[in-house]
Amino acid sequence: MAETTMKININNFKRIDVMQGEKQVSSEDDVVFSTVLGSCIAACLYDPIAKIGGMNHFLLAEPSGSDHDPNSLKRYGVYAMEVLINAMLAKGAHRNRLRARLYGGATMRSGFGDIGIKNAEFARRFLQDEHILLNAEDIGGTTARRVDFCPALGLARCRHVENQRPVERLEVVPDKAGDVTFF
């Protein structure tokens, strides 16, 4: 699904960072939500009539059977999606008008399983089950993303953060015995 690029200048907008486990909702014209994603997912929802939008940022799709800690719920997509939708409805959005954009779900490191893929599959399935139209997505791959979303306008920009070259490691030479002078 092709992504459209934001064609407005957001330099003077009030920037609100959306960190892992958080959600933000606004109807203000001069607000932009921003987040950085790897395997996590950010869902940007928007009601085009009410001009209300929101963004969440979740780490994992669904809790495992062994996770019974209520404090960890914020990490999961099922919680993040419901909380975002409820906050938007409380501000005046209508569920049947919601539109979505999805970002993230990258495979950042081998050995961590298919976390990004599972997150993306969950988000798509959730939107389908809730009859929320998916307008755009930038999902998968192996690079991190920076996402900016103007909630009142429903516009988003997603930029891939290219892999940086590895940090050069300096060799540490241990001190020789007897190199210390005591006073």
Curated annotation (Swiss-Prot):
UniProt key word Hydrolase: yes
GO function term, MF aspect, one: protein-glutamine glutaminase activity
EC id: 3.5.1.44
The keyword Hydrolase is annotated on this UniProt entry: yes
Keyword line: Chemotaxis, Hydrolase
Catalytic activity: L-glutaminyl-[protein] + H2O = L-glutamyl-[protein] + NH4(+)
CDD domains: CheD
Domain of life: Bacteria
InterPro entries assigned to the protein according to its UniProt record, in alphabetical order: CheD-like_sf, Chemorcpt_Glu_NH3ase_CheD, Cytotoxic_necrot_fac-like_cat
Pfam families named among the record's database cross-references: CheD
HAMAP family cross-referenced by the UniProt entry: CheD
Biological role stated in the UniProt entry: Probably deamidates glutamine residues to glutamate on methyl-accepting chemotaxis receptors (MCPs), playing an important role in chemotaxis.
Record protein name field: Probable chemoreceptor glutamine deamidase CheD
The organism of origin for this protein: Zymomonas mobilis subsp. mobilis (strain ATCC 31821 / ZM4 / CP4)
UniProt lineage: Bacteria, Pseudomonadati, Pseudomonadota, Alphaproteobacteria, Sphingomonadales
